[in-house]
Curated annotation (Swiss-Prot):
Record's subcellular location: Mitochondrion inner membrane
Miscellaneous remark of the record: Heme 1 (or BL or b562) is low-potential and absorbs at about 562 nm, and heme 2 (or BH or b566) is high-potential and absorbs at about 566 nm.
Gene name of the record: MT-CYB
TM region(s), chain numbering: 33-53, 77-98, 113-133, 178-198, 226-246, 288-308, 320-340, 347-367
Cofactor(s) this protein cannot do without: heme b
Protein name, entry field: Cytochrome b
Cited function: Component of the ubiquinol-cytochrome c reductase complex (complex III or cytochrome b-c1 complex) that is part of the mitochondrial respiratory chain. The b-c1 complex mediates electron transfer from ubiquinol to cytochrome c. Contributes to the generation of a proton gradient across the mitochondrial membrane that is then used for ATP synthesis.
Gene3D superfamilies per record: Cytochrome Bc1 Complex, Chain C
Subunit structure and binding partners: The cytochrome bc1 complex contains 11 subunits: 3 respiratory subunits (MT-CYB, CYC1 and UQCRFS1), 2 core proteins (UQCRC1 and UQCRC2) and 6 low-molecular weight proteins (UQCRH/QCR6, UQCRB/QCR7, UQCRQ/QCR8, UQCR10/QCR9, UQCR11/QCR10 and a cleavage product of UQCRFS1). This cytochrome bc1 complex then forms a dimer.
Domain of life, per lineage: Eukaryota
Species, as recorded: Genetta johnstoni
GO MF terms held by the record: metal ion binding; ubiquinol-cytochrome-c reductase activity
Length: 379
C-alpha cells in the first residue's frame, strides 16, 4: 500500500515540497534564508492579526490605540515589538537571500528570480504602510514624503497623489486605506511565495558550485529540515533578544510623538531597511530622476540575468567578481549610513559617489569582470 503522504492530494504537495524533495548535497547555510523568510512571514501575520484586534485606523485614536496595546492589553507590548522588530528580521533575511542569489548565480532561474523581485517590492510596500499606522510624527511625515514622490510622474502625478491620499493631504482616508492594504498584502505575499516555490521546484535548487547536481541529490527531510530548524531557533533567539532587551533600537524616537501636520521633524527618514534606496533618491537633485533611481535601485536586479557574461554560474571560483560583490555590500552599507544623515556636506557628495558606484557595479563592472575571468581561463 502506498504511503498516505504520497497518495493523499494535499499531503502529496507537502511531501514533494518539504519531505521527499531532492536537494543538492552541498548547499550551505546561505540556503537557510528562504525558510527563515517563511517563518518571518508567519510571525508577522500572527502578531499582526492580534494587533489588528486592538488597533483603530482613525487619525484621532490610532496613536492612543497603539499606546493602549502596549499598556493595557495582555502581553500587548511583546506582540507589538515582535511585529515591529520582526519586520527588521524579515528584511535582514530578505537582503541575505537576495545577496546569496547574486553571489551564487541563482538569478539564472529567471521565473523564480523575477517573482522574488516582485515579492521584494510587495514586502517593501507592506512595511512602508505598516510604518504609517502608529500615526506618530515619522509615520505621518514619512507617508507625506513618500506618497508625494508620485507627483513627479508627468501629467497624472498630482491627480494620482490626491487619489491615493483620498483628499488634499495625508489624513483619515489615507490611514484607513493604508491599514486595509497593510492587512491584505501579507496574504498576497504568501500566495506569491507559493508561486516562487512552485517555479523553484520546477528547476531544483542551485548550489554553491553553480554546477548541475542531479547526480548528487539527498532528500530534504531529515537533512535540511533539521538544518532549517537550527536556523529558525537562531532567528527566534536574535528576534527575542532584540524585543526583550532593546525593542526601540531600530525605531525612531520621533514616532513616540503623535502626528502633527503643523510641525515638521528636523530629519525625515524611513526605517533602516529603506535607507539605502532613500540615499539613492536624495543623491539626484531632480525629483523625477530621483524617483526613477529609487525604483531602479531594486528593479536593476531584474536585468542581472541579461548581464551575466561569465561562463561560470557561481562566483565561488571567480575572485574578481567576488571582490566586486563585497564592494557592492560595502557600498550598500555606506548608502544605508548616508540615508540616515542630514542633507549637508560631505554627506551629499558621499551619497552621490556611492549611488554612482552602486549602478556601475551592476551595469559595467560585473559584466566586464565576467569577460576578464573568461579570458584568464582561456575560454
Amino acid at each position: 500500500m502506498t504511503d498516505i503522504r504520497k497518495s493523499h492530494p494535499l499531503a502529496k504537495i507537502i511531501n514533494e515540497s518539504f519531505i521527499d524533495l531532492p536537494a543538492p548535497s552541498n548547499i550551505s547555510a546561505w540556503w537557510n534564508f528562504g525558510s527563515l523568510l517563511g517563518v518571518c512571514l508567519i510571525i508577522q501575520i500572527l502578531t499582526g492579526l492580534f494587533l489588528a484586534m486592538h488597533y483603530t485606523s482613525d487619525t484621532m485614536t490610532a496613536f492612543s490605540s497603539v499606546t493602549h496595546i502596549c499598556r493595557d492589553v495582555n502581553y500587548g507590548w511583546i506582540i507589538r515589538y515582535m511585529h515591529a522588530n520582526g519586520a527588521s528580521m524579515f528584511f535582514i533575511c530578505l537582503f541575505m537571500h537576495a545577496g546569496r542569489g547574486v553571489y551564487y548565480g541563482s538569478y539564472t532561474f529567471t521565473e523564480t528570480w523575477n517573482i522574488g523581485i516582485l515579492l521584494m517590492f510587495t514586502v517593501m510596500a507592506t512595511a512602508f504602510m505598516g510604518y504609517v499606522l502608529p500615526w506618530g510624527q515619522m509615520s505621518f511625515w514619512g507617508a507625506t514624503v513618500i506618497t508625494n514622490l508620485l507627483s513627479a510622474i508627468p501629467y497624472i502625478g498630482t491627480n494620482l497623489v490626491e487619489w491615493i491620499w483620498g483628499g488634499f493631504s495625508v489624513d483619515k482616508a489615507t490611514l484607513t486605506r493604508l491599514f486595509a492594504f497593510h492587512f491584505i498584502l501579507p496574504f498576497i505575499i504568501s500566495a506569491l511565495a507559493a508561486v516562487h516555490l512552485l517555479f523553484l521546484h520546477e528547476t531544483g535548487s542551485n548550489n554553491p558550485s553553480g554546477m548541475m547536481s542531479d547526480s548528487d541529490k539527498i532528500p530534504f527531510h531529515p537533512y535540511y529540515t533539521i538544518k532549517d530548524i537550527l536556523g529558525i531557533l537562531l532567528l527566534i533567539l536574535v528576534l527575542m533578544l532584540l524585543v526583550l532587551f532593546s525593542p526601540d533600537l531600530l525605531g525612531d524616537p520621533d514616532n513616540y510623538i503623535p502626528a502633527n501636520p503643523l510641525n515638521t521633524p528636523p530629519h525625515i527618514k524611513p526605517e533602516w531597511y529603506f535607507l539605502f534606496a532613500y540615499a539613492i533618491l536624495r543623491s539626484i537633485p531632480n525629483k523625477l530622476g530621483g524617483v526613477l533611481a529609487l525604483v531602479l535601485s531594486i528593479l536593476i536586479l531584474a536585468i542581472i540575468p541579461f548581464l551575466h557574461t561569465s561562463k561560470q554560474r557561481s562566483m565561488m571560483f571567480r575572485p574578481l567578481s567576488q571582490c566586486l560583490f563585497w564592494l557592492l555590500v560595502a557600498d550598500l552599507l555606506t548608502l544605508t549610513w548616508i540615508g540616515g544623515q542630514p542633507v549637508e556636506h560631505p554627506f551629499i557628495t558621499i551619497g552621490q559617489l556611492a549611488s554612482i558606484l552602486y549602478f556601475s557595479i551592476f551595469l559595467i563592472l560585473m559584466p566586464v569582470s565576467g569577460i576578464i575571468e573568461n579570458r584568464l581561463l582561456k575560454w
